[in-house]
């Protein structure tokens, strides 16, 4: 379910979630009671040097990109924890991308705020401005190129299955098409043409990382998080430990005292 949701979010929450992005997953396995951490964050491109790391290049535009890790992570968790095929979990996302969904105001606002950057690239114009303008909230929004990419990944899996490969091998075939095949070459071409840094070599080197999560307790609850992120992770656990001794109920929800404590 998590993999299916993430694929669909690539379309319906594109400014925050994408198979071309990066992320962290903390997973509770009910059968064993174990908790796992999966780092789906790609590395910075090898070609990125200190002189290129400016406030402008690191925050927006083609040069801000790092190796996309989420798709590889989704394949890894689907293989290790899931039962369904990639074809099954990608089916909803492909359907929405082909047939459309009523685009929401938040996504429209985001596209509008990034219009100047998006219009620099014909592929972005084709995807984000299908009518030549910023979409209007409530309009049916399709993304045919996204559907095509998702279908290519499913095709790699299904072709492997038809040739007698195992489920794990078939999922690996989809992984390889993204990170080592024609999709990786398309990444390479785009970044070269637009003075970016990501190369096919960067993509080929990527692997998701499974790790032991960091852990603490908070008022009788076990709290787990990723050891490999600065947003959340150990920082959040430390914050919980720091406020545990305060009587937040007595201080009052959203009171000045409570907000001051949490902000500090």
Language-model segments: what does each one mean?
Residues 1, 70, 258, 262:
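Hydrophobic (often cysteine-bearing) scaffold residues that line and stabilize catalytic clefts
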Residues 2-173, 178-227, 231:
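Noncatalytic scaffold domains of N-terminal-nucleophile
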Residues 155-156, 214-216, 221-264:
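Internal alpha/beta scaffold segment
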């Amino acid at each position: 379910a998590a993999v299916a949701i993430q694929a669909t979010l690539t379309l319906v929450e594109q400014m925050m979630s994408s198979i071309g992005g990066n992320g962290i997953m903390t997973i509770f396995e009910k059968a064993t009671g174990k908790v796992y951490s999966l780092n789906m964050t790609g590395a910075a491109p090898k070609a990125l040097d200190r002189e290129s790391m400016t406030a402008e290049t690191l925050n927006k535009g083609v040069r801000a990109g790092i190796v996309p890790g989420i798709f590889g992570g989704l394949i890894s968790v689907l293989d290790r924890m899931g039962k369904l095929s990639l074809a099954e979990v990608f089916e909803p996302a492909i359907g929405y991308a082909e047939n459309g969904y009523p685009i929401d105001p938040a996504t429209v606002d985001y596209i509008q705020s990034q219009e100047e950057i998006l219009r620099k690239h014909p592929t972005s114009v084709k995807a984000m401005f299908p009518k030549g303008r910023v979409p209007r909230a409530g309009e049916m929004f399709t993304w045919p190129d996204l559907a095509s990419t998702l279908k290519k990944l499913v095709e790699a899996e299904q072709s492997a299955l038809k040739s007698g490969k195992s489920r794990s091998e078939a999922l690996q075939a989809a992984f390889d098409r993204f990170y080592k095949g024609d999709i990786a070459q398309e990444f390479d071409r785009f970044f070269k043409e637009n003075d970016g840094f990501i190369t096919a070599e960067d993509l080929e080197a990527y692997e998701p990382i499974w790790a032991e999560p960091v852990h603490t307790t908070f008022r009788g609850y076990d709290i787990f998080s990723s050891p490999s992120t600065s947003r959340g992770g150990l920082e959040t656990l430390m914050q919980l430990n720091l406020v545990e001794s305060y009587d937040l109920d007595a201080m009052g929800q959203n009171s000045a005292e409570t907000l001051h404590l949490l902000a500090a």
